[in-house]
Amino acid sequence: MIRISLDLMGGDFGPQVVIPGAAKALDRHPDISFVFYGLKEQCDPVLAKFPKLKEKSVFHDCELAVSMSEKPSQALRRGRYISTMWRSIEAVKTGEADVAVSAGNTGALMAMAKFCLRTMANIERPAIAAIWPTLKGESIVLDVGATIGADAQQLMDFALMGGAMARALFEVERPTVGLLNVGVEEMKGQEEVKEAGRLLREANIDSLEYSGFVEGNDLGKGTVDVVVTEGFSGNIALKTAEGTAKQIGEYLRAAMSRTLLARIGYLFAKSAFDMLREKLDPSKVNGGVFLGLNGIVIKSHGGANAEGIAAAIEVGYDMAKNGLNQKIENDLKKYHAKRLPPMGPEAA
């Protein structure tokens, strides 16, 4: 049984969408049980419509919900210990749940997750990993906005964590990893990126295969299983891809409404165009994973519908079932053990 704690008040639509999303996830995975955190008056009427879900869940009434516009520091001060967001994360810390899922304010969620769960040993900064649609299926891109900037060692840690996530999600034995750069040549790019490339080449890690530098146009090609970058560049790439998907959708809509014949053709092809737009948009592959914490936290897109919420829950389900954090901890331990200088008589 995989136990999932769910912030029912997160996102643009709160329990009206989050609860039906949980019901969809339960239909697909009967071995899920839920721990819900919400505001009773708003959640009870919706939950009553899903008796099967109510049976497989425990509901905790909370004092407040974090708004989508609150600053992380304000949310932490106001909502620590008593908000739906905090308590859903705390359930992972206490062992009541295996994974926490929220569609709430990203900054507040990261601040609370870091404060409540703390980072793993040898991890200076957590990262947000996005599942990215590609021509070959899906890949993982991290960091897409947890922190701005990263040194070579932090990029190295991101590579290890991303590789572990790829093994848990895609079930590949040795995922390929690339560093996002302005060119594939070794002499190009910022010093920290070049140094991270050197570290990855020399580390010879058996849990991943370093494929060198990749460029922005490789993101959609699926050139590698994992693309590593720092949060500023990663977030720009994510928002650019989301915007491009919407732009293409608008172009198609405009082109197909210019004449009566085009409008008739659009009606017949609408589902295909919608599928194209969704394929291009990383936000539709819902469920950003916070990596590097002592517990699994999944961030759903705030504007997700019930299907999107279900997808985020399923990402959390897969991560917990396939032992994501154990894989990360093992990989970090092996790598950092190699870096330690020899001790005892052998060192002399």
Swiss-Prot record:
One annotated Gene Ontology cellular component of this protein: cytoplasm
Main EC class the enzyme belongs to: transferase
Catalysis performed (reactions): a fatty acyl-[ACP] + phosphate = an acyl phosphate + holo-[ACP]
Pfam families, per the entry: FA_synthesis
Keyword Calcium: no
Principal cellular location given in the protein's record: cytoplasm
Domain of life assignment: Bacteria
A single GO BP: phospholipid biosynthetic process
EC number: 2.3.1.274
Listed pathway(s): Lipid metabolism; phospholipid metabolism
Location(s) in or outside the cell: Cytoplasm
Cross-referenced HAMAP family: PlsX (MF_00019)
NCBIfam families: plsX
Subunit structure: Homodimer. Probably interacts with PlsY.
Protein family: Belongs to the PlsX family.
UniProt protein name: Phosphate acyltransferase
Organism: Rhizobium leguminosarum bv. trifolii (strain WSM2304)
